[in-house]
């Protein structure tokens, strides 16, 4: 490595907000199943605190050695609906509290996996878990919940979509932060290191390390050097930058897995913003030539960014996975917040951007009087984009305040302007229930 590359790396960290957003340990809880919920909770606590006992210390050591910030250390676990189903319990709050206590005791930032996979219907544990979500998130600090309501193979479970519209409302009423820790997915992935949607899939090894990188500031600085150049040059520049970012992510993941004695899973190539100035995906898109994010051309700019990041990342790392696309969370991106306040970015444009990025309606505040059926219809729209386009989509919305208010979440979650919602009703559509069938192109065998 020549001196220029060393200087570039130093600049990435000190001036361009490059960091490893998270190292996430995925832990299988399938061997914690028990017919007694209190025994199951004890087993869950024991396994997490044993397997992840050194996760935070190892993360801090690697960050100090490499001089690269590792912002979060997290844990993801087997969807709790699968564990709880073996019990006769009528709610899974004891399991949520066991997760929370384990997370607090080992010092991680979040623990994900209070989850249910219901794309084709409910089993007993799914229904109980979903009804437990509002209180589980209200009575814990670090637990994150997710529900997968659709997949390209299965279609969309519209009964679950309707339920989740109601659950999101109840969760927002039960606690200030609850709805920010709840994600509704279509085509959820099993190796996602990012919260709030991380869970440890049943097809995964017993324990793995997955890494999520972050580098929108680095990409923006690289694009500043090619202003006025063609799209070919633009794409190549993003690709080379993504290669460098991902290479560091792979190094951190390998070091962590070796020191913790667990397998290395994947590097998630997602560009994840923070509320800090200079760490915004929106500003990357504007650097491409848009006056403000949300104007015409935004979706095309996002498509170029997303594709080039993936191409550069795949070259840098032999194990990529997770969501691996640009994140566009409104409250966590100062450029997105400015675009909403400037009247350039609305819910409809964010929905269009979902066809490209990895999440979609993410960390968006809407008026608290929004009907649960309207929230369910938003989920259905996002799920439809994911199911038809064979990609992951998700909704993380917070019904709080009234249009024009600013809702402060603090930390990485930032501040969200309350956005306008279409006032016309979707209630009769949502009331139908049942299943939207899988698309014709899902039949691959």
Curated annotation (Swiss-Prot):
Gene3D superfamilies: 3.20.70.20. Pfam families: DUF711. CDD domains: RNR_PFL_like_DUF711. NCBIfam families: PRK05313.1. Belongs to the UPF0210 family. HAMAP family: UPF0210. Homodimer. This is UPF0210 protein Sez_0396. It comes from Streptococcus equi subsp. zooepidemicus (strain MGCS10565).
């Amino acid at each position: 490595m020549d001196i220029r590359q060393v200087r570039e790396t130093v600049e990435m960290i000190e001036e361009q907000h490059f960091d490893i957003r998270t190292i996430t340990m995925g832990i299988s809880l399938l061997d914690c199943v028990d017919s007694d919920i209190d025994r199951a909770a004890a087993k869950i606590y024991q396994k997490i605190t044993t397997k992840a006992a050194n996760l935070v210390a190892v993360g801090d050591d690697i960050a100090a050695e490499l001089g690269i910030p590792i912002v979060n250390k997290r844990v993801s676990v087997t969807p709790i609906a699968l564990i709880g189903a073996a019990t006769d319990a009528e709610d899974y709050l004891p399991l949520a509290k066991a997760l929370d206590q384990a997370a607090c005791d080992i010092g991680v930032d979040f623990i994900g996996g209070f989850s249910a996979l219901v794309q084709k219907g409910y089993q007993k544990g799914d229904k109980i878990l979903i009804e437990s979500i509002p209180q589980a998130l209200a009575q814990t600090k670090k637990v994150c919940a997710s529900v997968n309501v659709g997949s390209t193979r299965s279609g969309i479970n519209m009964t679950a979509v309707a339920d989740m519209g109601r659950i999101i409302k109840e969760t927002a009423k039960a606690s200030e932060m609850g709805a920010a820790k709840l994600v509704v997915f279509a085509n959820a992935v099993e190796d996602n290191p990012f919260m709030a949607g991380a869970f440890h899939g049943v097809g995964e090894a017993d324990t793995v390390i997955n890494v999520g990188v972050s580098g929108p500031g680095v990409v923006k600085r690289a694009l500043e050097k090619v202003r006025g150049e063609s799209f070919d040059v633009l794409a190549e520049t993003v690709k080379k930058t993504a290669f460098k970012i991902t290479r560091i992510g792979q190094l951190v993941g390998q070091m962590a897995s070796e020191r913790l004695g667990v397998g290395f899973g994947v590097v998630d190539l997602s560009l994840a913003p923070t509320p800090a100035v200079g760490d915004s995906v929106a500003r990357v898109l504007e650097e491409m030539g848009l006056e403000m994010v949300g104007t015409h051309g935004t979706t095309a700019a996002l498509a170029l960014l997303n594709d080039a990041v993936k191409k550069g990342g795949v070259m840098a790392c032999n194990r990529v996975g997770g969501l691996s696309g640009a994140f566009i969370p409104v409250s966590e991106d100062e450029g997105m917040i400015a675009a909403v306040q400037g009247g350039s970015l609305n819910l409809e444009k964010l929905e269009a951007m979902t066809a490209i990025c990895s999440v979609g309606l993410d960390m968006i505040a809407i008026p608290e009087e929004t009907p649960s059926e309207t929230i369910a219809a938003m989920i259905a729209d996002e799920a439809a984009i994911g199911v038809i386009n064979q990609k992951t989509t998700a909704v993380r919305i917070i019904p709080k305040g009234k249009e024009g208010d600013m809702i402060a979440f603090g930390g990485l979650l930032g501040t969200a302007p309350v956005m306008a919602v279409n006032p016309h009703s979707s209630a009769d559509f949502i009331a139908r229930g049942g299943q939207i069938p899988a698309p014709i192109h899902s039949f691959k065998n």
